[in-house]
Amino acid sequence: MNMKTLIIFYHPYDGSYCKAILKAVQEGLKRGGHPHKTINLLRDAFDPVMHEKDLQAFAVYGRTGDITQSDVDPLVLHYKKKLEWAERIVMIFPIWWMTMPAMMKGFIDKVIFPGVAYNMDGPQLVSRLHSLKQVTIISTMNTPADVYRDRFNNSLEGSLVKGTFNQIGIHDVEWISINMVKQSGQEKREIWLEELEEKFAK
């Protein structure tokens, strides 16, 4: 079954392993006949900073129920349309200091936002992304998996899987953590890329 897939990508270095992952995922989706679009936050010059006018958009949404009536970042509205189109999201980024980079966190802050990605129904958060069925998070890091789990409590799982997507009612969330990237040889890296391409070709 084909799935309309939105890739959300961030890494500042064009020669990064994350960029190789992006290409593998795109190739797999192409082979599998899955319609797909890519948000490249750096290429889009996305501003991750939450400015006063961005917070004011929350108040406007509270009064009107329409985020588009506020002075919201135009890129946010552009991303909103892509999110509404998607049946699956694939996020690709590195782990820095045990969490996602500021650019990706800014995307969560400004785009997974009331009136954009969810509505507030009393204490409940209700997804507005009615087509979205699945989220896959692919992260890279140089920390061993057991250290990230035992010492840092898989912090990304708490903040992004449970604290963001699960909270707005999206529970089919898969996190693929690729660990010890710098310490791994070229052969191992190629195997990871082949596995990812095959996964998204299905």
Q: What does each of the following model-derived ranges do?
A:
Residues 3, 34, 133, 170-171:
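A structural micro-motif
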Residues 9-11, 139-142, 177-180:
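Short, histidine-centered active-site or binding-site loop motifs used for metal coordination
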Residues 119-166:
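Short, glycine-/small-residue-rich phosphate/pyrophosphate-handling segment
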